[in-house]
Amino acid sequence: MAMEIGEDEWKVCCGSSEFAKQMSTSGPLTSQEAIYTARDIWFNQVNVTDWLEAFSAHPQIGNTPSPSINSDFARRSVSEQSTAFATTSASALQELAEWNVLYKKKFGFIFIICASGRTHAEMLHALKERYENRPIVELEIAAMEQMKITELRMAKLFSDKAKVISETDSSSSPVSTKPQDRLRIIGGHLNVAAEAKAPKRSRPPITTHVLDVSRGAPAAGVEVHLEVWSGTTGPSFVHGGGGVWSSVGTSATDRDGRSGPLMDLVDALNPGTYRISFDTAKYSPGCFFPYVSIVFQVTESQKWEHFHVPLLLAPFSFSTYRGS
């Protein structure tokens, strides 16, 4: 069911004013449409200042929220850290507080992690591990963690609003007893589910960008090639398997490090095994890696999702992750 949600409600999901404003003007949205819209706004529309505003709305991990913070936001933060508070001690909280100070001094913003279901030890380990990152890499990771938090809060928001609507309808509408009425209601639910499952895309389902972490800047002019595996069996780790890689599309990164379209704009992505390759030698002749290839799978249940597969490149190392 598509819902109209106000700016204040969106700001409980994410502390960025610009994010909340853009989400409120994008509705009405179904829960699935809201996820795709939120990801697009967060990663492609708002700027770094908006990211930092969202980060600053959170209490530091291990701390209770300040009374000055929005009460609904504060209650969510306490709930999300409940597992951590239940698995810690005074001395452990002190160690976490000390690492929080070190982290903020290095990066300029507080440590952001999707705390829901995580123990104190897990979060402290993640903090220590991420402390070693370069600032520009850590900023991206923090933005991704914020999106995870936002999506969890959005799911709760839609669930709560749907419950209110359901209770209102059941108290104000007569009970339908005719078989044809029951069929009409069931059909309506099925149609809503189908609509929610197939949101209209605003960009191709597979995208990428390249970040040169040695310079702390986007890598422009990197040739990118996307392929899909064609064969009766999947590709083998050693021998390649019974099939071939078929070209889907080629592009190059722009000054922001983002590639052009690598495939057509389709709503449903064909399930299968994909390979995205980067001509790193042409971009950086002294690079240890002449090219980088990343292989990933898309299942039937994921065909409506977006796959952002970036490359974080340095002369002697690289990393990747699945973004949104």
From Swiss-Prot:
It is a peripheral membrane protein. It is found in: Cell membrane; Peroxisome. GO terms for molecular function: 2-oxo-4-hydroxy-4-carboxy-5-ureidoimidazoline decarboxylase activity; hydroxyisourate hydrolase activity; identical protein binding. Pfam families: OHCU_decarbox, Transthyretin. Residues 2-29 are annotated as: Required for BRI1-binding. The active site is at H58. Disruption phenotype: Longer hypocotyls and roots, as well as greater fresh weight due to plant growth promotion. Enhanced sensitivity to brassinosteroid (BR) in term of plant growth regulation. Increased freezing tolerance to cold treatment. The double mutant b1l ttl exhibits a developmental phenotype and freezing tolerance comparable to the single mutant ttl. Phosphorylated by BRI1 in vitro. GO terms for biological process: allantoin biosynthetic process; brassinosteroid mediated signaling pathway; cold acclimation; protein tetramerization; purine nucleobase metabolic process; regulation of brassinosteroid mediated signaling pathway; regulation of cell growth by extracellular stimulus; regulation of seedling development. GO terms for cellular component: cytoplasmic side of plasma membrane; cytosol; extrinsic component of cytoplasmic side of plasma membrane; peroxisome. This is Uric acid degradation bifunctional protein TTL. The gene is TTL.
